[in-house]
Amino acid sequence: MLYAIGLRLIKPPFFPLKEINIQVINGTGSSNMELQRITHEQIEHIARNEIKGNFLSMNLVDVRDAFIRLPWIREAKVKREWPHGLNVTVEEHRALAHWGSHALVNTYGEVFRVSIDEKLPVFIGPKEDSAQEVAQQYQRFSRILAPIQQDIAEINLSPRHAWRIQLDTGTVLELGRNEIEIRLARYVSVYNHSIARLNQQEPLAYVDLRYPDGFAVRMPEVTPHVPRESGGRKAT
């Protein structure tokens, strides 16, 4: 989607900048997009307060930096359009999840800081550098869970690189550090004919999948320190 903003207040005597054209793209390069988070008022503020000089003298690096500073802008490219225009191509962040309680993760697995009150999964990791790994694993976990129509509410990656998932039902799945996708797939494979029966009254509180030939479950009313085991020696 192309937006054009006229600039009546920017009138240097020679080569005045009269128009800014905004093109919105997504991560695949598609340009048939609309602004979702950035407002026209924010763009006009940049045009009237951040762009210095005329069509020829304005510093394109400074203009790009002004757009990048907008909280929801992930990337921006600017170029002159003869004789009095400026073309700006922007890509907005697309929020995938909350990162803890103070930031967001976009679909690239990048952490950015914007405050929103939206229901999104929560990612927790030992450091921001791990956000991309958590985002990638979220996609894999979601595909595995799709057959039983359960969504992820929270993913926790510990400093020891152990994985834990909380589902939208409230059930916590302990996956450990090894064979995490195999363990989750095993949970899905037995869900309909085994685990779902235990879920008839209330969702399970906890399922420990770190056993090579079984798993342990905790019912909501059971004391947390005494899980009921289905067999096997717990792995890591």
Task: Label every PLM stretch briefly.
Residues M1-N54, M58-R69, E75-T236:
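Charged, solvent-exposed interaction patches on well-folded alpha/beta domains
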